[in-house]
Amino acid sequence: MFKIGNLELQSRLLLGTGKFENEDVQTEAIKASETNVLTFAVRRMNLYDKNLPNPLANINLKDFITFPNTASAKTAEEAIRIAEIAKHAGVCDMIKVEVIGDDETLLPDPFETYEACKVLLERGYIVCPYISNDVVLAKRLEDLGVHAVMPLASPIGTGRGINNQLNLSYIIKNSNVPVIVDAGIGSPKDACHAMELGADGILLNTAVSGAKDPVKMAEAMKLGIHAGRLSYEAGRIPVKYTAQASSPTEGLGFL
């Protein structure tokens, strides 16, 4: 259990709700993950256009912390407008600020992200910005007052795992707010790795929804994240460059 702002998260797995084959698979995967935080793109909801489908219609959102994101925003102004739509619809316990700066890599725009966070904090939101693994930006956003930072492991949807372990480690080490690794996680191994580095949680979607068996993968991710956290808390042995026997050398005098 950990907190973002005044919200208590029962699970360190935050699950995206898009791209599932159907509602039944989505529901079973959510159940298997044991998450209590669901994230979704506001633009995919029927919050401002009732003619659009509601991909969360079969989910009782009262059982979850709702974590909408501002996906599709390319400016701070657009991100703020999307956040306001979610808030007025009553599905915004906290907001993931996602402002894309490049259409090919889908990397976040640091300048627009910062400006959006500044305004949303002034308006009383629990703000969690999605960022690249920029150590300086993470600290500047923390100084601004964000409630968590969400550095990517690798570009959205690539499943490449952690591309820059050094920078991610710096962000985790220097942060006084929760660090949620977001984007690029492809397997439970990737999720476990991020948690072993000391991340507070993992946000993922495609790794589960795109798996051959999303329900099993949701459970695997849950277990991988749990194992990684336990490993971090237990403290791994230091890496050495010479072999060291695990058996005692006493009692070998008779040889």
From Swiss-Prot:
<feature type="binding site">
    <location>
        <begin position="205"/>
        <end position="206"/>
    </location>
    <ligand>
        <name>1-deoxy-D-xylulose 5-phosphate</name>
    </ligand>
</feature>
<dbReference type="GO" id="GO:0005737">
    <property type="term" value="C:cytoplasm"/>
</dbReference>
<dbReference type="InterPro" id="IPR008867">
    <property type="entry name" value="ThiG"/>
</dbReference>
<keyword id="KW-0704">Schiff base</keyword>
<feature type="binding site">
    <location>
        <position position="157"/>
    </location>
    <ligand>
        <name>1-deoxy-D-xylulose 5-phosphate</name>
    </ligand>
</feature>
<dbReference type="Pfam" id="PF05690">
    <property type="entry name" value="ThiG"/>
</dbReference>
<dbReference type="InterPro" id="IPR013785">
    <property type="entry name" value="Aldolase_TIM"/>
</dbReference>
<comment type="similarity">
    <text>Belongs to the ThiG family.</text>
</comment>
<comment type="pathway">
    <text>Cofactor biosynthesis; thiamine diphosphate biosynthesis.</text>
</comment>
<keyword id="KW-0808">Transferase</keyword>
<keyword id="KW-0784">Thiamine biosynthesis</keyword>
<keyword id="KW-0963">Cytoplasm</keyword>
<dbReference type="GO" id="GO:0009229">
    <property type="term" value="P:thiamine diphosphate biosynthetic process"/>
</dbReference>
<feature type="active site" description="Schiff-base intermediate with DXP">
    <location>
        <position position="96"/>
    </location>
</feature>
<protein>
    <recommendedName>
        <fullName>Thiazole synthase</fullName>
        <ecNumber>2.8.1.10</ecNumber>
    </recommendedName>
</protein>
<feature type="binding site">
    <location>
        <begin position="183"/>
        <end position="184"/>
    </location>
    <ligand>
        <name>1-deoxy-D-xylulose 5-phosphate</name>
    </ligand>
</feature>
<comment type="function">
    <text>Catalyzes the rearrangement of 1-deoxy-D-xylulose 5-phosphate (DXP) to produce the thiazole phosphate moiety of thiamine. Sulfur is provided by the thiocarboxylate moiety of the carrier protein ThiS. In vitro, sulfur can be provided by H(2)S.</text>
</comment>
<comment type="subunit">
    <text>Homotetramer. Forms heterodimers with either ThiH or ThiS.</text>
</comment>
<dbReference type="GO" id="GO:1990107">
    <property type="term" value="F:thiazole synthase activity"/>
</dbReference>
<dbReference type="InterPro" id="IPR033983">
    <property type="entry name" value="Thiazole_synthase_ThiG"/>
</dbReference>
